[in-house]
């Protein structure tokens, strides 16, 4: 049987060997397990709780994918910079790690239909709040390697000094330790973090374009991609991602965000 809720025990998958050919849908079904790459340290989207179980918005979705495929799910922890490589090396079948769709990434992987909307945000200590990008002049901004925040600031604000980390947990610890003046990543994530860390505030709540978050598969894995798209459309009929939000995000955000500003149903962005 497969897990039907967000309480999936943390585990790691082994690489499928030296071949770079992605597993087909039939091969995944026959194996009885789908390998899904998720974050282990990006609460409330993908994280490991104190019982060693994977939790979060992406994980709730991943559990449903496995259930509807009729397989178990094997979670593989990824960091932002490793997401593409884990697909191309077949360490995972699908990435569900808060993966923002960009033109550059779409050259390397195939994105399915989106299930979430997002922009960038900037969090900083309340006593030295960064509320405008101009406030970052002469300051150090913490970002994750391989993230849209890194790309955005390098392209649009090259004079801003960036301090980069592989892991989100490292990045936030750097902010707590005062190694940087602010941190930028998805606004959905910094809003959640600031609510749980007294003395910090999101001074810039929406920066850059409104982007979408989507599952990704290895380039050319059309069969799995088509199945994912059909699944996302089908889930839209039951308002699945509204339920996902209410289960995993609403307990964190409360009334500070509007559900429909974040959630995408049936792959259709409104």
Predicted regions span which residues?
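Flexible hinge/capping segments at coil-to-helix
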Residues: 27, 124-141
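Extracytoplasmic small-molecule ligand-binding "clamshell" domains
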Residues: 10-98
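Periplasmic-binding protein-like
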Residues: 116-124, 191-232, 252-270
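Short loop->beta-strand "edge-of-pocket" segments that line small-molecule binding or catalytic clefts
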Residues: 32-38, 133-147
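Extended ligand-binding regions for polar small-molecule ligands
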Residues: 2-4, 59-68, 147, 212-254
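Ligand-binding clefts/hinges and TM-proximal coupling segments of bilobed small-molecule sensing domains
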Residues: 15, 19, 151-165, 202-204, ...
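Short helix-initiation/N-cap motifs at beta->coil->alpha
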Residues: 21, 74-85, 128, 145-148, ...
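A ligand-binding cleft/hinge motif common to bilobed small-molecule-binding domains
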Residues: 85, 99-107, 154, 176-177, ...
């Amino acid at each position: 049987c497969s897990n039907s809720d967000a309480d999936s025990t943390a585990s790691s998958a082994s690489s499928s060997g030296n071949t770079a050919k992605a597993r087909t849908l039939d091969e995944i079904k026959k194996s009885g397990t789908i390998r899904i790459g998720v974050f282990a340290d990006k609460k409330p989207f993908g994280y490991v709780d104190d019982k060693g179980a994977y939790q979060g918005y992406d994980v709730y979705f991943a559990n449903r994918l496995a259930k509807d495929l009729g397989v178990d799910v094997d979670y593989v922890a990824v960091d932002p910079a490793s997401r593409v490589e884990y697909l191309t090396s077949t360490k995972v079948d699908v990435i569900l790690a808060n993966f923002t769709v960009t033109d550059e990434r779409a050259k390397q992987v195939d994105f399915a239909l989106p299930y979430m909307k997002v922009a960038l945000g900037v969090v900083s200590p309340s006593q030295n709040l960064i509320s405008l990008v101009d406030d970052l002049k002469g300051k150090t901004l913490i970002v994750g390697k391989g993230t849209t925040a890194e790309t955005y600031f390098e392209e649009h604000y090259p004079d801003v000094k960036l301090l980069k980390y592989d892991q989100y947990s490292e990045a936030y610890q750097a902010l707590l330790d005062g190694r940087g003046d602010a941190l930028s990543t998805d606004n959905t994530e910094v809003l959640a973090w600031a609510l749980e860390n007294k003395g910090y505030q999101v001074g810039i709540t929406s920066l850059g374009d409104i982007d979408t978050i989507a599952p990704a598969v290895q380039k050319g894995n059309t069969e799995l991609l088509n199945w994912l798209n059909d699944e996302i459309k089908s889930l839209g009929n039951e308002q699945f991602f509204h339920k996902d939000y209410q289960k995993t995000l609403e307990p964190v955000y409360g009334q500070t965000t509007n559900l429909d500003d974040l959630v995408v149903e049936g792959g259709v962005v409104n």
